[in-house]
């Protein structure tokens, strides 16, 4: 096998660090997705496995453009159910779906140069008026769910 045809390990854009005081730090740095296609997305399944693999308080540093709101909602719920204290620090940007995850922190901190971007949900839809009405109803439900975060 040549060097070019060798599979490369997926590069992950999140990393858990075990701190000396027993707490953990998560660096969440990349797009939020339901499934991993390129190996760089934060997915709920992977997140849950790593969240439950330790204990103690956690600090989450977020720098993410957002992504799949349903995946973000799952991660938000996991963090809300977590037994330890959850602190969020926005490092750069917590945009779109990442802003939902940021709201799971008991304390949320931002520097003066970081950004939190919240917007109305959006989608692409094709079909007749019935399909468009379904899409509108779905967007309204998503909007209400993220407002509740």
Positions of predicted regions on the chain:
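Terminal-region recognition feature
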Residues: 1-149
């Amino acid at each position: 096998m040549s060097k070019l045809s060798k599979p490369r390990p997926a590069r992950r854009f999140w990393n858990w660090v075990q701190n000396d005081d027993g707490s953990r730090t998560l660096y969440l740095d990349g797009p939020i997705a339901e499934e991993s296609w390129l190996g760089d997305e934060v997915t709920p399944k992977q997140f849950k496995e790593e969240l439950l693999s330790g204990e103690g308080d956690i600090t989450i540093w977020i720098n993410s453009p957002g992504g799949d709101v349903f995946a973000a909602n799952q991660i938000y719920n996991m963090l809300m159910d977590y037994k330890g204290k959850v602190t969020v620090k926005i490092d750069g940007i917590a945009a779109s779906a990442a802003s939902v995850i940021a709201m799971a922190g008991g304390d949320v901190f931002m520097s003066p140069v970081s950004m939190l971007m919240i917007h109305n949900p959006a989608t692409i839809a094709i079909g007749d008026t019935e399909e468009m009405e379904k899409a509108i109803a779905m967007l309204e439900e998503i909007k209400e769910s993220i407002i509740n975060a």
